[in-house]
Amino acid sequence: MLTLENVSKTYKGGKKAVNNVNLKIAKGEFICFIGPSGCGKTTTMKMINRLIEPSAGKIFIDGENIMDQDPVELRRKIGYVIQQIGLFPHMTIQQNISLVPKLLKWPEQQRKERARELLKLVDMGPEYVDRYPHELSGGQQQRIGVLRALAAEPPLILMDEPFGALDPITRDSLQEEFKKLQKTLHKTIVFVTHDMDEAIKLADRIVILKAGEIVQVGTPDDILRNPADEFVEEFIGKERLIQSSSPDVERVDQIMNTQPVTITADKTLSEAIQLMRQERVDSLLVVNDERVLQGYVDVEIIDQCRKKANLVSEVLHEDIYTVLGGTLLRDTVRKILKRGVKYVPVVDEDRRLIGIVTRASLVDIVYDSLWGEEKQLAALS
């Protein structure tokens, strides 16, 4: 699908931003470029759509050299998403999404249908089509930025740190949505990030760059288990290598508790406290009759609100980290250890609760990792 052959970029004065990059990307593959500031990751990506012209080498998309194409026409065939989103404030959401199809002279009705179809993919209804960007939250605006890149059905999408400016919960939610979207649409994606956790979570393969050169290319598991050198090991961070000592435990389903303590939103706060006391827990997951996760309540929330509220529905918090069933365990480890989360609910694609991973669930894995390391050191000494 996409091939880079001996691609380099040299600026005036002889500074080499990218040096002799060679890479083949298959159709439908999700590739993350990552590395320290100034490593050439964004420059490499921008050479693909000729926002930056290569100084040397060749880039082929579906066997066609990009230098043989008109740069404007080339860019219209490639989706592009940036951190700043770049929505036009004077255009409606539908007009923003339909920008490239309009340039490609799609009929108006087809553009409208495409906008509604895409909004549905990210659970945004037709009521959004006539709104303006300032009426949307930051997360919703970034969703529209992604949909705009998908609107003309390009086979290739370039994404330059698209979620970098969002708060952690919104960022996490968008990553989950985008991962699900990619499974449905099978686009070829080149994604630039400075966040190793994001790369590990999203990518089929990760390309690590340093000083304009590729240091290592591999799947997240390959790189976690076999870092190419000390630079890669330090860049990954040892806290991300916890799972490598427990290769038999890979997915949340293997360690989650399938019977988390739950309550429905119509119950009283007194009933919630009684249930917590009975089950010896300090928080409850709130679900509806179909076990769709609504949010959570805990002792602290109830204590703060008990004088002015009576029902769980009045005090439940909806912002909660979740992972899909089948998610790689490393993503959940990251949420619990790095973000200080006490637990992570596991849901299906319809957000029905199927389990929970707690800090206690991870004790054996962390213990095996640390104990295995100590035994290795003892054997070497």
From Swiss-Prot:
Keyword Nucleotide-binding annotated: yes
Phenotype when changing residue 341 to I: In strain: 168 / LH45
Consequence when changing residue 320 to L: In strain: 168 / LH45
Gene Ontology CC, one term: membrane
SMART domains the record matches: AAA, CBS
Result after altering residue 82 to F: In strain: 168 / LH45
Residues in ABC transporter domain copies: 2-236
Keywords: Amino-acid transport, ATP-binding, CBS domain, Nucleotide-binding, Repeat, Transport
Highest taxon above the source species: Bacteria
Ligand binding (ATP): 35-42
Result, substituting residue 313 to G: In strain: 168 / LH45
Induction and repression of expression: Repressed by GbsR.
Its job: Involved in a high affinity multicomponent binding-protein-dependent transport system for choline. Probably responsible for energy coupling to the transport system.
Protein name per UniProt: Choline transport ATP-binding protein OpuBA
Naturally occurring in which organism (per UniProt): Bacillus subtilis (strain 168)
